[in-house]
Each structure stands twice: as C-alpha cells, then as structure tokens.
C-alpha cells in the first residue's frame, strides 16, 4: 500500500512538473506596438497579430501611444521589458530614436522586430516589410500616372511626418521616379498631417486651396489619404487625382462615390500575422538567416532577405528583412472583396 502511494505521488509529481513546464512554455508573451492607437490600419495589424498569437498559444498584447512619439514608444518598450515580455514588435516612428531602448532590450534577451516602419537595422533582428521603397514608390507614381495623362502636371505629396522612416523612403523613390519618367510633372509642395485626422483634413484643404490647378495628391498615409479625399469632396474638386495608401474599409465610401479611382496597400492583417510567426520562430530558435524560409498557415512561404533590399549597408547573422508576399491596388471592382 505504501509502495502504491509512493508510486502515485511520484506520478502526480511528474504530471505536475510536466503541467508546470507546459504552462511556462505557453506563457510566452509578445508585445505588438503600433505608431499610435485609434487608427484602423494599425488596429487591423494588431488583429492579425493577436489571431496568430491564439493559433500559436502565445499571449500577444497590442498597445501603443495615443500620439505618434518616440517618447511614448520608448516608454512602452521599457514597460514591456520590465514585465519580462519575450519579444517586442514595433512600428517605429523614428529610424534611430528608439534604438537605445531597443538595444537595451536585446541585451536583456528580448527579441526585437519591426513591422510597417523600420528602425536602423542594427536596432532589431527582422523587419516585417510591406514592400521595398522602390516597389512602393513606383506603385504610388504608377497609380497617379493612370489618371494624370498630361505631360505637364502639378503634384503634391501629403503624408504623416518628415521623420517617419517608411513613408519618407517611399516618397524619396517616388520623387526620383517622377524626375526620371515624368520630367514635366512639378512637385509643388510636400506637407504633413502628423497622424492627426483633424490636422490632416485642414492640411489637405489648405493644399487644394493653395493650388487650384493641382492635378494630383499622392498621400501614402492611412490618415492623409482619406483626409485628401474628404477635402476634395468638401471643396468640390472632382477633377483631382487622389492616390496613396490606406485601408479598404476607410476608403470604400470615397471609391464608391468616385472621388478616389484607385489606391494601394498590402494586407496589414497578414503583416501582423507574419510578424508574430517570425517572432515565434526566433523564440523557438528556428533557423532565420538570409535565405531561410518559414511556412505560415493560410499565407504561404516567406523568406528572409538581406537588409540591402531596403537600401541598408548593414548585414549580420540573425538579421534581415521579411517581405510580404504581395501588394494590392484597390478600385471599385475589387474593394468589396476586402474587409480590414
């Protein structure tokens, strides 16, 4: 009887230890940080990240500052590190402003990734990238060229800020493409809405009023593009080409009314999912060097590319770029197929 009891205790102890180990393993936590909360684009990315977390048994926390600031993001990063999160995935408002905090986090063993907007590559392991600057800059100009068929035209650029990494890289490439392929296009102004819906609308209306002969507004920003469309409707400017990047749910009414003929983006829900799957691969010590691939359920295979794809000169082991499989141009024929 005593021997039976000892065996039972041993079995229960082993079961308890196994359960505890499983609990510890399942308790991995990932923080997914946007530039700011309250914007549909970032919310959709967060939804994708949390869906992936549920599928993987990982606790994914979505949180960000109420305004797009380095200090707000640094505070969140530090908080998550102090709470012993295993990985942090951040859409950086600055290429270098977050670097000291991110490097400290990496020194403490936290896996650091970026999504949507990158830091300097030495400040993270992988960037989950919607497209190279050349791809997205070209996409912007091509969408505008579909509507502006004049040799000489006036174009305005309008997006979030002069310091944000991703949009400035795209705009730099777009301006270079205009210079090479549309030398008659004059870029009359470049202005910013600073991720604020009210300010973005005011700025867009100001651009349209200041340039009554404007032919196109290129707005590669989730707040700026709908603001430009709303401004055109408010001021009854029906002959203005408005293109850029935003989510289909936000832009649907403008497309249905014909104010916006086409605009672009990528599947940001997929971007959130891919980010968490890559972070999970790092936490599981799976090989993730340049050339290595990862199969993601419902999405397919993604491959690690060198940082040079983004125009960087920094390469290191365990460091690189994971490109989304595709980008999308939305118009009245396909917009109702998407819900994000």
From Swiss-Prot:
GO cellular component: ATP-binding cassette (ABC) transporter complex; outer membrane-bounded periplasmic space
Keywords: Periplasm, Signal
One function term, GO molecular function aspect: carbohydrate binding
Source domain of life: Bacteria
Coiled coil location: none
Intracellular or extracellular location(s): Periplasm
Signal sequence range: 1-26
Gene3D superfamilies named among the record's database cross-references: 3.40.50.2300
Subunit structure: The complex is composed of two ATP-binding proteins (LsrA), two transmembrane proteins (LsrC and LsrD) and a solute-binding protein (LsrB).
Function recorded in the entry: Part of the ABC transporter complex LsrABCD involved in autoinducer 2 (AI-2) import. Binds AI-2 and delivers it to the LsrC and LsrD permeases.
Family, per entry: Belongs to the bacterial solute-binding protein 2 family.
Protein name (record): Autoinducer 2-binding protein LsrB
Organism for this UniProt entry: Salmonella paratyphi A (strain ATCC 9150 / SARB42)
């Amino acid at each position: 009887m005593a021997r039976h009891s000892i065996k039972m205790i041993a079995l229960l102890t082993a079961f308890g230890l196994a359960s505890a180990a499983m609990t510890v393993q399942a308790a991995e936590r990932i923080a997914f940080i946007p530039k700011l909360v309250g914007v549909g684009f970032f919310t959709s990315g967060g939804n994708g990240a949390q869906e992936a977390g549920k599928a993987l048994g990982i606790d994914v926390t979505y949180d960000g500052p109420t305004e797009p600031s380095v200090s707000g993001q640094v505070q969140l990063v530090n908080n998550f590190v102090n709470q012993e999160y295993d990985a942090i995935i951040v859409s950086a408002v600055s290429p270098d402003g977050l670097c000291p905090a991110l490097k400290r986090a990496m020194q403490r063993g936290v896996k650091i990734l970026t999504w949507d907007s990158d830091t300097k590559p030495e400040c993270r392991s992988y960037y989950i990238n919607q497209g190279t600057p050349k791809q997205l800059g070209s996409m912007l100009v091509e969408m505008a060229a579909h509507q502006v068929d004049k040799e000489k035209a006036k174009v305005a650029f309008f997006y979030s800020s002069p310091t944000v990494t991703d949009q400035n890289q795209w705009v730099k490439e777009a301006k270079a493409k205009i210079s090479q392929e549309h030398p008659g296009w004059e870029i009359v102004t470049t202005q910013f809405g600073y991720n604020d819906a009210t300010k973005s609308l005011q700025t867009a209306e100001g651009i349209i009023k200041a340039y009554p002969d404007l032919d196109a507004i290129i707005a590669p920003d989730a707040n700026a593009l709908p603001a430009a469309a709303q401004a055109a409707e408010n001021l009854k400017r029906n002959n203005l080409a408005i293109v850029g990047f935003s989510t289909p749910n936000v832009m649907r009414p403008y497309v249905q009314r014909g104010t916006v003929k086409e605009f672009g983006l990528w599947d940001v829900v997929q971007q959130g999912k891919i980010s968490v799957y890559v972070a999970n691969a790092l936490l599981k010590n799976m090989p993730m060097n340049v050339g290595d691939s990862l199969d993601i359920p419902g999405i397919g295979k993604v491959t690690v590319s060198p940082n040079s794809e983004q125009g960087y000169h920094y390469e290191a082991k365990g460091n690189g770029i994971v490109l989304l499989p595709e980008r999308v141009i939305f118009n009245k024929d396909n917009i109702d197929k998407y819900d994000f």
